[in-house]
Amino acid sequence: SFDISPDGKHISYLAPYKSRMNIYVTGIDLAEPHQVTFEEDRDVEGYMWANNNRILFMKDDGGDENFQLYGVDADGSDMRPYTKMKGVRTHILDDLEEIDDEILIETNQRNPEIFDPYRLNLKTGEMTMLAENPGNIQAWMTDHDGKLRIAYSIVDGVNQEMLYRDSEDEDFRPVIRTSFKEDVSAIVFTADNKNVYAITNLGRDKSALVLMNPATAEELE
């Protein structure tokens, strides 16, 4: 699979090396490609550009499907594991396109059955837990500043609850509960991070795009 760096200056792709898929990078003119990773035990399963220079990729060890997150510079230097923990699985939650050196990830390092969200500093490797998942959170949503502000949980096995907080210093609080026949799905925050655009079918026979106050679930327009 081919991918282009955010500044449009480099192209990356996967190709075999010693029977394993690895990352290669070349200029936009496709001249002089160079190998970035040299994995021999397992394939690079997926990768992405974190910024114009840093590439992130996923790989498991020994086929245990506990995928870990690694990072490497586009020239092949500074390769490091970010979440190499035995028995732990990692997911990328949000690549935070507007923040170069941070991403949000989920890991089950606290509890094997539950994934908690963390902010990962790509320069230092520091991980900061953003919330403790009680076990029923199915989705998280950030604002344009990369702050985790909305969560969705499953209640009673069938109903869904939207939770909200004004800042990451606060606890999430429930805003609205919907049945399996109803839907309120926040899509994106407005530019000022105060309201959200959402898809909902509440009070109507078809889903509609609305402007909503996430603190109250009130439709504004």
Give residue ranges: language-model regions:
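Short loop/turn segments that connect beta-strands within beta-propeller blades
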Residues: 27-31, 73-77, 121-125, 166-169, ...
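Conserved beta-propeller blade repeats
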Residues: 1-14, 40-61, 69, 86-109, ...
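Short helix C-cap/helix-to-loop transition motifs enriched in small/turn-promoting residues
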Residues: 30-34, 53, 63-65, 72-80
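Short active-site-adjacent helix-start/loop capping segments
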Residues: 20-22, 32-34, 43-46, 63-66
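Beta-propeller domains
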Residues: 13-38
